[in-house]
Amino acid sequence: MLQQAIDRDPVDRIDRYPTRTAEPAPHIERLDPTVWGEVHSEQLSTFDRDGFSIMENLLSPEEVSEFRAEVERLAADKSLLDDERVIREKTSNRVRSVFEVHKLSAAVADLVRQTRIVGLARQVLGSDVYLHQTRINYMPGFRGTGFYWHSDFETWHAEDGMPAPRAVSLSIALTDNYPFNGSLMVMPGSHRTFVPCVGATPADHYRESLREQEIGVPSTEDITVLAQRYGITQFTGRAGSALLFDSNVMHGSANNITPFPRSNIFLVFNSVENTLVEPFAAPAPRPTYIGSRDFTPL
């Protein structure tokens, strides 16, 4: 059932994570749990401590081949040439991301409902979950553009109206991730610190930010402080491995100037107890293919 942003008690509209401010603001220590369910495994303990957990061989080699063919099909699909869900590189015009991929691919639609996938999110979030966002990311060799340091929750809170960081992302690698081909960098433990960002959100900001984000990113001073406090590590591994990470963990990736491309399936699960309201720091919500307002549990 499709639901619109619902009216809530005024207490739910208290902004506990203010951002997009006129002036730099102090960091905010996280006010919410990092694992909402019981911590009863080493994997959940690692997630609680670091804000992420790596799973080897989440997909079999056969599944990797099937999904790789599927994402290549979507990137080449001429019927999607003018589709808003397809985001292209700012300079090369190559496909960068395809959003709402679970509605474009029956294979992905089946994958997101499998217990081995959605069960991970339920464990961390301690509730039923729904899909906040799905997409495929492409980083071609030589000209693949990275993502600057950011917290996903900062954007989802400011522009989608997500009240709390009670959401998790699952990035499933469809290609080998090396330290040198733009693999994701994360700051272990940074999910416990919310970094307010400076600058008002323009109307339709998503049209530019999905290609190159300049508003809603931390300052170099912020990144320096966090890196010194938490350090930086990389998600590397064979195709089929996956990274489950907290919505507020600080992460980013460098450009890929190697011949080795990267691609991944990116799934975002939000708790049904954390459904979207009106944006906290934007003129209007982003389109539903970016921030879903269908809160039907999986």
Curated annotation (Swiss-Prot):
Protein name: Ectoine dioxygenase
Record function comment: Involved in the biosynthesis of 5-hydroxyectoine, called compatible solute, which helps organisms to survive extreme osmotic stress by acting as a highly soluble organic osmolyte. Catalyzes the 2-oxoglutarate-dependent selective hydroxylation of L-ectoine to yield (4S,5S)-5-hydroxyectoine.
Known EC number: 1.14.11.55
Assembly and oligomerization: Homodimer.
Binding residue positions for Fe cation: H150, D152, H251
Residue positions binding L-ectoine: Q133
Species per Swiss-Prot/TrEMBL record: Nocardia farcinica (strain IFM 10152)
Co-factor binding comment: Binds 1 Fe(2+) ion.
Gene Ontology molecular function terms on file: 2-oxoglutarate-dependent dioxygenase activity; iron ion binding
Region (Disordered): 1-26
Site positions (Important for ectoine stabilization): W156
Keyword line: Dioxygenase, Iron, Metal-binding, Oxidoreductase
SUPFAM superfamilies: Clavaminate synthase-like
The keyword Metal-binding appears for this protein: yes
Family of this protein: Belongs to the PhyH family. EctD subfamily.
